[in-house]
């Protein structure tokens, strides 16, 4: 039993080592200024979607700071302590993020919808399709332009046929976060924006 437990711990450590090496390699090759933080707690309910990370104001973090993982955008810092930060996830029902449809350049806002993102009140004349990839638009200066966000997996048209809505599945598996990237902008961001 003890040998089996040690074997399981070793396998887990090897997997974690591989993930960390991959993240460090990505950080070194990224044009963005980043650092790696570890997720210390997850709080996910139907409407509220947050994680807690092990860095805070003492590490230079700021409210609104973009947070990613290797798969794409996961959220932004919304509560800051000296040695920890709460990150609101992109799927939280109070979160919104400016996006761009990669195929067409259409820009709109994606809203958190529990486990997915929702695009609401998009004119029916807009070219939007299931399978379209959504990236950050760069508007608002919180998220650099072009970061992977989600892919559209369903669409509907309003009863009066003036608007269409879409649901999008995030690229990042938000229920399996262990390590994240914190992104610093090229120019300083003030919290008064």
Language model features with spans:
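A secondary-structure micro-motif
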Residues: 5-12, 18-193
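N-terminal leader/propeptide and maturation segments of large enzyme subunits in energy/redox metabolism
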Residues: 1-3
